[in-house]
Amino acid sequence: METLSQDSLLECQICFNYYSPRRRPKLLDCKRTCCSVCLQQMRACQKDLRCPWCRGVTKLPPGYSVSQLPDDPDVVAVITIPHASENTPVFIKLPSNGCYMWPLPVSKERALLPGDIGCRLLPGNQQKPVTVVTMPMEQQPLHGNIPQDIVEEEHERRGVVKSSTWSGICTVILVACVLVFLLGIVLHNMSCISKRFTVISCG
């Protein structure tokens, strides 16, 4: 088989979608790999599974489904499909002296798979390479691998956010009180001005 790039190894060569728990990499008898969704569509249209490239037939016994075909071990080794729900958080690990973890948004269409390498923009348009790592919920460290000073800094930052919210609310209330006070002074002065021009009768 010809040498494939890392990206083409991670995607089905029929639909060009990345392999995922829903689109598992299935191995045909001719040793080519397609995603389970494409193979299910092919199976619905024809009795036997024919490889789109070499036309080799992969026979499935009666009552067997595409999901019972073996996964391609080479592809599975690269993508390491996790047994987790789509709500499992995904983190990136920055290669540096310390270990920093940042939550990433996960979309269904273009979700990053474990082992994907990307980059994160830093101030000054510098790029830092990152590697994506997924962790099942029960294995996620609370603060085990993160240095204590970073944990404290994060707690302080969250405390600042809470205190800045309260200080904003207090500021609004204080400004409202000052405006009511000033309005009272203005109204009082206006009532005094109108009394100045009235005739005072002497008794």
UniProtKB/Swiss-Prot annotation:
Gene Ontology terms describing biological process? cellular response to amino acid starvation; negative regulation of TORC1 signaling; positive regulation of autophagy; protein K48-linked ubiquitination; protein K63-linked ubiquitination; protein monoubiquitination
Pfam families the UniProt entry points to: RNF152_C (PF19325)
According to its record, what are the GO cellular component terms?
A: lysosomal membrane; lysosome; organelle membrane
Q: Does the keyword Calcium apply?
A: no
Q: Which GO terms describe its molecular function?
A: ubiquitin protein ligase activity; ubiquitin-protein transferase activity; zinc ion binding
Pathway listed: Protein modification; protein ubiquitination
Q: What is its EC number?
A: 2.3.2.27
Which catalytic reaction applies to this protein? S-ubiquitinyl-[E2 ubiquitin-conjugating enzyme]-L-cysteine + [acceptor protein]-L-lysine = [E2 ubiquitin-conjugating enzyme]-L-cysteine + N(6)-ubiquitinyl-[acceptor protein]-L-lysine
Query: Where in or outside the cell is it found?
Result: Lysosome membrane
Its keywords, alphabetically, are: Lysosome, Membrane, Metal-binding, Transferase, Transmembrane, Transmembrane helix, Ubl conjugation pathway, Zinc, Zinc-finger
So which domain of life are we looking at?
Eukaryota
Q: How does it sit in the membrane?
A: Single-pass membrane protein
Q: Which residues cross the membrane?
A: 167-187
Where is it mainly found?
membrane
Family annotation (SUPFAM superfamilies): RING/U-box
Disulfide bridge positions per record: none
User: Which residue stretches are annotated zinc finger (RING-type)?
Assistant: 12-55
Q: What does this protein do?
A: E3 ubiquitin-protein ligase that acts as a negative regulator of mTORC1 signaling by mediating ubiquitination of RagA/RRAGA and RHEB. Catalyzes 'Lys-63'-linked polyubiquitination of RagA/RRAGA in response to amino acid starvation, thereby regulating mTORC1 signaling. Also mediates monoubiquitination of RHEB, promoting its association with the TSC-TBC complex and subsequent inhibition. Also mediates 'Lys-48'-linked polyubiquitination of target proteins and their subsequent targeting to the proteasome for degradation.
Q: Which family does it belong to?
A: Belongs to the RNF152 family.
The protein, known as? E3 ubiquitin-protein ligase rnf152-A
Native organism is Xenopus laevis
